[in-house]
């Protein structure tokens, strides 16, 4: 008998769920009752067990009896109203969330182990984060293991501390929680006086009750950053400040230290968005390297020097590099012996140390790597013998790898980026043919969809996603106007999700269209994208160029001299200013002028 062809009805599952949902109103189709706050809701056991591992476990450990009695499932901590909303979600996949109910829905989804619903709640909470609630959302997310939401709320708190410190939520913090907040190294304040003033406002909010905590709270202040003349001025005008300074012996009123003593005690708040380069090979010897460096284009325009960071545990080339949730991840690639690797490492910028990661399912190099909400997606590449179309995903919190649907085609040295929680695969080649095609992968549906192709086919390009935009830089292709194998650098392109088409960027000040140019990475920081590579300008080589998205123009970025390394991995990483300052001091990158007495 012939095997035939598999056919499917895309509406089958939706129709079936609608029919099952209609049965909820008919007692003859319900075989159990949920009991909440003394009220009973008729349900269908098999549907509920299929949706909730928690309910399934209760049924397994306490199976229904054959005596004809109605099976009852008691649930505590969930209101009847919220449970009805969740039952509607189970049958429809839709739920209405708002700021009044989100906490109750998260608690219920957590109890019932409804992972998909919890994910929807996380996305809703991400859009709610503001100065007025970020501390509360941060604590709530930590309690319910909403890791990505906790990271975003912490990042918001660090970035917008001055706004947060003026809110009612901040003024109502407990002494212990206040100490935790003002101890954060990356508070973006510019001057410690703003942290000091925030603590003063907190104490003044309930002076009588909080005086007893005054000394303990002030111990978390970074007093080395307070100016003594500012403190004396505040003492003249504010009786509460006089009392605090008198009570707290750690607050300085003497003249500030000078020279080496000042540098030794100085501890700047805040953070810098750094360009980080990792691995690659030495330019002259072509020997793979484990070196890691960072440069802070927005930290100090007059001192944009490369700072040495802790090296990898082993040299890597053709590896994948990505920053996610405040850490840096390096995966795969090849070692000094050209052996393709499955291993990976995670860098902690607070400790300046590396730790090993669980290995990938497949060793690979020249692959794509993107991140969505704390999940690292590894796409394609090569294993030394063959070109790969496999994809796997690493959860950075559970530290586990899972296989994902394959790519639809080989994209040798293609480029990849994430935008609006979707993955885009662009260009690349196979068996001597280059592609301009672009595909989009939605992790929710686990489906690939073709979108508008690039204007130029290319391989060896780099890409990044920013908000609703995709950018593709560099890559090469063969010249079409001559016979032979001469290669040219492709023009950069831009795609907006609203317009659904690619547009050329003006690359006049990036590099000339010669095969001698090669792009290693594109790093979005603030309103700019920094492109790193061997950029042939026609008169010399640049290593980093800044693309300002608002004007569509290219600009020089120090250092202008070419690096001693090439083919490095690149990423953006937020690093505490106090950590950078110590590293710069240790590496002799600061020059201070000490005035003679």
Curated annotation (Swiss-Prot):
InterPro entries per record: BACK, BTB-kelch_protein, BTB/POZ_dom, Kelch-typ_b-propeller, Kelch_1, KLHL16_BACK, KLHL16_BTB_POZ, SKP1/BTB/POZ_sf
Cellular component, GO annotation: Cul3-RING ubiquitin ligase complex; cytoplasm; cytoskeleton
Subcellular location: Cytoplasm; Cytoplasm, Cytoskeleton
Entry keyword GTP-binding: no
Source species, domain of life: Eukaryota
Pathway in which the depicted protein is active: Protein modification; protein ubiquitination
Swiss-Prot/TrEMBL Kelch repeat ranges: 274-326, 327-374, 376-421, 422-468, 470-522, 528-574
GO biological process: cytoskeleton organization; protein ubiquitination
Domain BACK: 134-236
Post-translational events: Ubiquitinated by E3 ubiquitin ligase complex formed by CUL3 and RBX1 and probably targeted for proteasome-independent degradation.
Purpose: Probable cytoskeletal component that directly or indirectly plays an important role in neurofilament architecture. May act as a substrate-specific adapter of an E3 ubiquitin-protein ligase complex which mediates the ubiquitination and subsequent proteasomal degradation of target proteins. Controls degradation of TBCB. Controls degradation of MAP1B and MAP1S, and is critical for neuronal maintenance and survival.
Protein name: Gigaxonin
Protein species of origin: Mus musculus (Mouse)
Gene behind the chain: Gan
């Amino acid at each position: 008998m012939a095997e035939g062809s598999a056919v499917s009805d895309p509406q089958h599952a939706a129709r079936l769920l609608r029919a099952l949902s209609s049965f909820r109103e008919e007692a003859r189709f319900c075989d159990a009752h949920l009991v909440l706050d003394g009220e009973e809701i008729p349900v269908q056991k098999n549907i509920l067990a299929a949706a909730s591992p928690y309910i399934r476990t209760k049924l397994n450990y306490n199976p229904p009896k054959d005596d004809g009695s109605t099976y009852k499932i008691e649930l505590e901590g969930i209101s009847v109203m919220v449970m009805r909303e969740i039952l509607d979600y189970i049958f429809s996949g839709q739920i209405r969330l708002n700021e009044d109910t989100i906490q109750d829905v998260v608690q219920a989804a957590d109890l019932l182990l409804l992972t998909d619903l919890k994910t929807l709640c996380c996305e809703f909470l991400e859009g709610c984060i503001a100065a007025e609630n970020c501390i509360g959302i941060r604590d709530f997310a930590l309690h319910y293991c909403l890791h990505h939401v906790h990271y975003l709320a912490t990042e918001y708190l660090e970035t917008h501390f001055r706004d947060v410190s003026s809110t009612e939520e901040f003024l109502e913090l407990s002494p212990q929680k206040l100490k935790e907040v003002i101890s954060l190294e990356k508070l973006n304040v510019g001057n410690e006086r703003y942290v000091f003033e925030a603590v003063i406002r907190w104490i003044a909010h309930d002076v009588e009750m909080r005086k007893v905590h005054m000394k303990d709270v002030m111990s978390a202040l970074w007093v080395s950053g307070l100016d003594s003349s500012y403190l004396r001025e505040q003492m003249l005008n504010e009786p509460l400040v006089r009392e605090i300074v008198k009570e707290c012996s750690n607050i300085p009123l003497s003249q500030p230290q000078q020279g080496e003593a000042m540098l030794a005690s100085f501890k700047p708040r805040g953070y810098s968005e750094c360009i980080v380069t990792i691995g690659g090979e030495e330019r002259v010897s072509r020997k793979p390297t484990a070196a890691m460096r960072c440069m802070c284009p927005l930290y100090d325009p007059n001192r944009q020097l490369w700072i040495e960071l802790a090296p990898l545990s082993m040299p890597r080339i053709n590896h994948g590099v990505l920053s996610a949730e405040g850490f840096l991840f390096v995966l795969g690639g090849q070692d000094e012996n050209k052996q393709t690797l499955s291993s990976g490492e995670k860098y902690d910028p607070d400790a300046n140390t590396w730790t090993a990661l669980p290995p990938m399912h497949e060793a690979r190099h020249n692959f794509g790597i993107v991140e969505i909400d704390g999940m690292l997606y590894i796409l394609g590449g090569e294993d030394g013998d063959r070109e790969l179309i496999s994809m796997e995903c690493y959860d950075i919190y559970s530290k586990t790898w899972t296989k994902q649907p394959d790519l639809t085609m080989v994209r040798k040295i293609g480029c990849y980026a994430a935008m609006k929680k979707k993955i885009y695969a662009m260009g690349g080649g196979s068996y001597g043919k280059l592609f301009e095609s672009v595909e989009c992968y939605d992790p929710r549906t686990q489906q690939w969809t073709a979108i508008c192709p690039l204007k130029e086919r290319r391989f060896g390009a780099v890409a990044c996603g920013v908000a609703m935009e995709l950018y593709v830089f560099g890559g090469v292709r063969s010249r079409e106007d001559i016979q032979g194998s001469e290669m040219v650098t492709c023009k950069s392109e831009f795609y907006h999700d609203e317009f659904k088409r690619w547009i050329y960027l003006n690359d006049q000040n990036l590099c000339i269209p010669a095969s001698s140019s090669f792009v290693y990475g594109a790093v979005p920081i603030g309103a700019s994208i920094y492109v790193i590579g061997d950029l042939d300008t026609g008169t010399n080589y640049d290593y980093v160029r800044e693309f300002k998205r608002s004007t569509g123009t290219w600009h020089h970025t120090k250092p202008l001299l070419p690096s001693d390394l090439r083919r490095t991995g690149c990423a953006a990483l937020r690093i505490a200013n106090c950590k950078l300052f110590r590293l710069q001091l240790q590496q002799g990158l600061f020059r201070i002028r000490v005035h003679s007495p």
